[in-house]
Amino acid sequence: MAAVSPPTRCQALVTFEDVAVTFTDDEWKRLVPVQRALYKAVMLENYESIISLGLPVPRPDVILQFKRRGEPWIRGFHGSEEKTWPESVSLDLETKPETLDASRGTLREIHRKQSSLCPKREIQTLTGGPEPEKESPKARTCKKPLSLDKGLHQMSAPSKKALTKHQDQECSECGKTFFDHSSLIRHQRTHTGEKPYDCPECGKAFSHRSSLSRHLMFHTGESPYECDACGKAFFDRSSLTVHQRIHTGEKPFKCNDCGKAFFDRSSLTRHQRIHTGESPYECQQCGKAFSQKSILTRHLLTHTGRKPYECRDCGKAFYGVTSLNRHQKVHTEEPRYQCSECGKAFFDRSSLTQHQKIHTGDKPYECGECGKAFSQRCRLTRHQRVHTGEKPFECSVCGKEFSSKSSIIQHQRRYAKQGIDRGGSMS
């Protein structure tokens, strides 16, 4: 099926002005540097989104100014020449066939993103010239996207058949193929580690312009995506989509091995490492590997001895915030989860589940070396040190090493009785 040609509008070119937001000189002066940087990033991203539709869009003066690292033109574009973007210029486009099909949503987002920069502005529509912004049910706040369906309903993307013949951009590192050269360049940054987009506020670097745009919202305080159910706001649409599944209960990502379902793909990926045994995050200090980056981060603290999360009530410190939150329930609330067998109560469901295995005799964690099974993963980990000879707990007084924390605590009690603290000094 042949691709449908773009809407005629007297066969005129779709210009950048059709989706541009302009500022007066006074409005521009009121923007702080980080807002100007966000405006620049969004304008470039918007222009490239239109280019991705495959239409011969002229290159306006405002884009030329940005490319030269200059200030943007303030009101209007002062007679931009109608010339197409040269094919030799590499654009940083997030373009896939499926996203081309969603071009209407992309152009609607152009107006939504720009609406947060300045309260007074002109909005160029796709159906005519400049018109003042009107408050409608779909545009009451800057957090709601404007409805531009009327001017967009005729616009169509090139057919997939026309696009597939261009899928000849292959990564030399991993063999993955892409539909355009710019997508290949962006992908290759995952191998090279290149991050060409710097935040002017804090200096943090990013590999994608869209990631920089999202990050800049942290500095401006903008959270444009709001949950209708609870009012919580997010910096990007994907985070809002994942959050809304908490309210709907939808878990579209299912594990093929055990059938467990998850709200997002990243949680499924982390879970699947339990089945595959993959541990991609390795400690450079001791060589120990972990399935999740957060676990490695927490593990690194055991080498420094630093426990950054301290309880305000009793002063006890912890390596992770989840451990602190679990501990603080001791001070603030009663244990809610009670064992029906023995009456013992717990603060969280996972602790109760672990405890109930004592009564059921369930031992799902089996040692690969000797076949011995355990009811808890931590007990299996402790047991495996018998085979590996690992002794990660070292006494700060005498240097003796132990395979379990309980053993070193028992050992250090001897020094406590002698009046020697854990640092080795007399109290």
Curated annotation (Swiss-Prot):
Residues 111-142 are annotated as: Disordered. Keywords: DNA-binding, Metal-binding, Nucleus, Repeat, Transcription, Transcription regulation, Zinc, Zinc-finger. May be involved in transcriptional regulation. Its main location: nucleus. GO terms for biological process: regulation of DNA-templated transcription. It comes from Mus musculus (Mouse). It holds the Pfam family zf-C2H2. A zinc finger (C2H2-type) spans 169-191, 197-219, 225-247, 253-275, 281-303, 309-331, 337-359, 365-387, 393-415. Belongs to the krueppel C2H2-type zinc-finger protein family. This is Zinc finger protein 2. GO terms for cellular component: nucleus.
